[in-house]
Amino acid sequence: MEGIIVLDKPQDFTSFDAVAIVRGLTRERRIGHTGTLDPMATGVLPLLLGRATKAVSLLPETAKTYEASFRFGEAYTTGDVTGEVIKTDETPVLRAALETALDSFRGDILQVPPMYSAVSVNGQRLYKLARQGIEVEREARPVHIAELTLLEYNENEKTGKLHVTCSKGTYIRTLIEDIAQKCGTVGAMTALRRTAACGFTLADAVLLDTLKAMKENGESFDEILRPVEKLFSMLTAVSVTPAQAQRYLNGGALTISRCRAPKIAMPEGTQVALYEDGEKFLGLARAENGEFKYVKSFSEK
């Protein structure tokens, strides 16, 4: 089996749990995912099967989109309501003040990763230290918030929901805590749903229960498998001849001027997706010294 199953991960399952369950259902041993979702989070989790697992280390940097629910007035050890309350605050937050605060978090910002995260400091995972009650200094990291919209807000309950499109490595829990601080209070994430990642949306996703039902009914999973090239749809597509395709699959370089590449600037290091006759996906190549150099193929020779 080869391709991508876009899972709508259920709450209270780790990403590893999801991989293990799908491995059991599909009998495909080679399965990986494109980015961890916390157990409390739900939503888009692309799972790579078979040869598609080779794409994990090659994924382009793409934004991810979330809907995040929050509540002001309580701070938690974990930054979300799965932890223990460590501080309360009754400061009111008006919608107008919240909207103004959000302006400070759009675009390029610096964010300190939370203690309850998989980030390593001096070779130790932060979450392991946090579980021992140890807090260490962490360096702020640059992240990009492309979209930040207040979808809902109840001033009396101090609860609401945000739409967030952000770069890889952004912690939504921390974003909410920082927004609360900007509003002069404390806050925490109460729910998180990833609505888009790696070019996929919830419209592409299937539930675990659906996969289980398909297995029980003897249905093929082929109809829900997405092609691996979907992961690279944001790259420039280059068409090559069958002879060039064979040279590429053997590890050879291709002269850019002899390929049917779009007439656009191709800076050194640009990664492209190669297709035989514009249809069959071959793999990835990199522009270097007037040639497309082999990076990784996803096609049999």
Give the positions of each predicted feature.
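Accessory RNA 3′-end/elbow-binding domains used by RNA modification enzymes
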Residues: 1-12, 16-33, 37, 41-42, ...
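A short local loop/turn or secondary-structure capping micro-motif enriched for an aromatic residue
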Residues: 136, 169, 290-293
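Glycine-rich beta-strand-to-loop/alpha-helix junction loops that act as flexible
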Residues: 168-169, 248
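Catalytic cores of RNA-modifying enzymes
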Residues: 1-167, 174-206
